[in-house]
């Protein structure tokens, strides 16, 4: 899966983390980013949360964030999220735990745009496996770990006990596809 639809995005939010995510009132809340600072009208600086690890034990750093944005901004990727981040011109690494996002012009809605679930992938693992193999057995830093996928039947996730925001109360989640729109809930 490339996470190019809303149902896939819901699965993605469980397995991966984002810089910001909307709360129940649709207000962007920091996740992997701790905060932001406007350097100038087109440059936003984000310190990243330290101590976050991917499910394979690899620490999450600015390199992973930049890789994930660069991938999503590449027109060849054809990601579902591109329209939300198309105002981004460049992502720069300042240090291991700080990035800058440079936009094409002033973008007062950038935090809202970042809250539409641009997932952060482990750069080295993604490059090593390639997109197709990575998405068959995804590794994220989110509250749930990928366990298995049976095509047209189910995706199984288990709680990430080492999640930076506390282990989920639910220990196992099963996503089942419902092909008929009329029967979806």
Region spans (language model):
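Aromatic- and charge-enriched surface segment that lines or borders ligand/interaction sites
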Residues: 34-78, 94, 100
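A structural "hinge/loop" feature
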Residues: 1-9, 32, 58, 80, ...
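A local structural motif
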Residues: 44, 99-101, 165-176
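Short, hydrophobic alpha-helical packing/hinge segments within bilobed ligand-binding/sensory domains
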Residues: 68, 184-185
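N-terminal lobe/hinge region of extracytoplasmic solute-binding protein
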Residues: 1-40, 70, 139-140
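Gly/Pro-rich hinge or "lid" segments in bacterial periplasmic/extracellular proteins
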Residues: 23, 27, 115-168, 172, ...
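Surface-exposed binding/hinge segments that line
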Residues: 37, 82-125, 148-150
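Sec-exported extracytoplasmic/periplasmic mature domains
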Residues: 20, 24, 41, 53, ...
């Amino acid at each position: 899966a490339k996470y190019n639809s809303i149902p896939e995005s819901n699965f993605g939010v469980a397995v991966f983390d984002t810089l910001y995510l909307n709360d129940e009132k649709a207000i962007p809340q920091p996740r992997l980013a701790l905060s932001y600072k406007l350097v100038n009208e087109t440059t936003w600086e984000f310190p990243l949360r330290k101590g976050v690890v991917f499910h394979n034990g690899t620490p999450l750093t600015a390199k992973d964030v930049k890789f994930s944005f660069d991938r999503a901004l590449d027109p060849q990727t054809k990601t579902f999220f591109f329209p939300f981040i198309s105002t981004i011109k460049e992502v720069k690494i300042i240090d291991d735990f700080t990035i800058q996002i440079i936009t094409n012009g002033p973008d007062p809605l950038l935090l809202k745009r970042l809250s539409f679930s641009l997932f952060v992938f482990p750069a080295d693992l993604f490059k090593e496996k390639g997109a197709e193999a990575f998405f068959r057995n995804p590794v994220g830093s989110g509250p749930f770990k990928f366990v298995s996928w049976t095509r047209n039947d189910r995706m199984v996730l288990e709680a990430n006990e080492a999640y930076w925001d506390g282990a989920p109360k639910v220990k196992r989640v099963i996503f089942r596809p419902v092909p008929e729109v009329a029967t979806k809930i």
